[in-house]
């Protein structure tokens, strides 16, 4: 009698337990959806057991991070341990001076980790340009996924305690849960301790029918944005343009920039939708992270709608700390520029990110100046004339796209080449041929922008429709969406863009 071979089974188990840099565990992968289904079955058993639930979620979160960054899950544990004890010290300290030194220690530890892993080679490159190539050797430093997100999240906890807005947690596991919670661990939204921590020890954990339905809707829309729109237009159009801009006409270069604007929105907001949706299925609420940003009529409005958790973090912990708008107009404009420069640097250690931040900082400062000197310029939303709002949306979108060109291009030479093609080799006569040649990509780009520009009430109607549908119908919709994803997805899993930050 021959026993069935089990090598294949154990190979798969070993693969599940092994870190592979080329195969991170991401929300849009079939593996994650399979593991999450099993995770939810066990999670439901801990509905009335807060401590067991906390430990179980922490273990899964650390496994999730291990599959993305390997041994560097220990860095996450170190960050949680460090700020847990520093926060207790800040709260216990009797003098303002001692509290200040402790919060500075927290900031130094967090920014020190970020600086080492993210900016060491950038600083070495600057030194080599100043003192000659070979002055310093580049280091082989691994960048842990999502380090910028959990560092900011951890700093907000100690700063809030220093400001007297929060009391420190008594249980280290609660803080590790807050910092490592897997739905938002690697790409946000950047959580706020005062909003999230009160939810940790719910007993019993409550997932209402509305929460469940909304969670399903957000997961499905996130999958659609990421796997069907973002990945497809990236692989089949946008990447080709940015890789070899001289091979394409100015129209194609412009379409590539517009395509990237949609790609990065669908990629990042798709992740945020899935993160918020998964959290809802677990009984936790996160605030909205995107609010149709390309409907913005001003750059200020854009930053109220784009990556809301980062823009509010920069406002509350950097811009206001610099003085905000309390120290005169010139200082206000300078604070905006500094905040956005550092926001650009937060995204990555490269000149292109600094220039991207400088562009947005200068635009925000100029818009604030414009509002100060032009009567009626503060009008927003429905108070604007329709033609004024339409013109504002067109101008703001193209300004943002100029920023995306710098953000996406691998070098400033690529920026120059694409702008040259747009202004000197547009080749409008080729537009019909280009559109027919990339029919699938252009159809998705058009559909994506049309869906994005639909009235908010249409989105709310769709959400209510899905969230109030019978469970069987929700399962059918989920299965249909997964089938569609399988039909259009590339052979290789495409990581989320913001994983690199």
Question: Whereabouts are the PLM-identified features?
Answer:
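Membrane-embedded transmembrane alpha-helical bundles that form the catalytic cores
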Residues: 2-451, 455-500
């Amino acid at each position: 009698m021959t026993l069935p071979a089990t090598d294949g089974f154990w190979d798969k188990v070993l693969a599940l337990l092994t870190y592979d840099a080329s195969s991170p565990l991401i929300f849009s992968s079939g593996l994650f959806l399979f593991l999450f289904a099993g995770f939810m079955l066990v999670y439901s058993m801990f509905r009335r057991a807060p401590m067991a639930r906390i430990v179980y979620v922490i273990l899964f979160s650390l496994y999730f991070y291990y599959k993305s960054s390997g041994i560097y899950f220990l860095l996450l544990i170190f960050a949680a341990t460090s700020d847990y004890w520093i926060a207790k010290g800040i709260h216990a300290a009797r003098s303002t001076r001692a509290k200040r030194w402790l919060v500075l220690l927290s900031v130094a530890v967090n920014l020190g980790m970020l600086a080492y892993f993210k900016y060491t080679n950038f600083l070495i490159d600057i030194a080599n340009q100043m003192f000659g190539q070979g002055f310093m050797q580049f280091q082989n430093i691994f960048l842990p996924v999502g380090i910028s997100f959990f560092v900011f999240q951890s700093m907000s906890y100690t700063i809030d305690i220093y400001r007297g807005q929060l009391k420190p947690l008594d249980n280290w596991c609660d803080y590790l849960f807050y910092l490592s919670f897997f739905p938002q661990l690697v790409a946000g939204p950047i959580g706020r301790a005062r909003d999230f921590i009160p939810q940790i020890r719910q007993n019993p954990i409550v997932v209402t029918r509305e929460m469940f339905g909304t969670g399903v809707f957000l997961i499905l829309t996130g999958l659609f944005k990421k796997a069907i729109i973002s990945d497809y237009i990236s692989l089949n159009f946008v990447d080709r343009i940015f890789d070899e801009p001289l091979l394409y006409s100015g129209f194609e270069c412009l379409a590539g920039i517009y395509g990237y604007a949609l790609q990065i929105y669908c990629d990042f907001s798709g992740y945020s939708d899935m993160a918020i949706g998964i959290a809802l299925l677990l009984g936790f609420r996160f605030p909205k992270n995107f609010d149709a940003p390309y409907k913005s009529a001003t750059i200020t409005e854009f930053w109220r709608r784009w990556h809301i958790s980062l823009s509010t973090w920069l406002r509350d912990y950097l811009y206001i700390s610099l003085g905000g708008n309390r120290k005169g107009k010139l200082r206000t404009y300078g604070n905006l520029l500094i905040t956005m420069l550092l926001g650009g640097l937060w995204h990555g250690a490269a000149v292109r990110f600094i220039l991207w931040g400088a562009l947005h900082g200068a635009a925000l400062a100029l818009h604030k100046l414009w509002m100060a000197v032009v009567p009626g310029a503060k009008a927003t939303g429905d108070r604007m004339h329709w033609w004024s709002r339409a013109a504002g949306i067109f101008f703001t979108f193209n300004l943002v796209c100029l920023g995306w060109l710098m953000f996406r291009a691998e070098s400033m030479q690529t920026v120059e080449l694409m702008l040259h093609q747009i202004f000197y080799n547009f080749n409008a006569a080729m537009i019909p041929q280009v559109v027919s040649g990339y029919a699938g990509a252009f159809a998705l780009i058009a559909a994506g922008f049309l869906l994005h520009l639909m009235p908010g009430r249409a989105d709310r109607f769709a959400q209510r429709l899905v969230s109030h549908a019978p469970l069987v119908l929700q399962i059918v919709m989920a299965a249909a969406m997964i089938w569609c994803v399988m039909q259009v997805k590339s052979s290789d899993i495409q990581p989320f863009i913001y994983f690199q930050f």
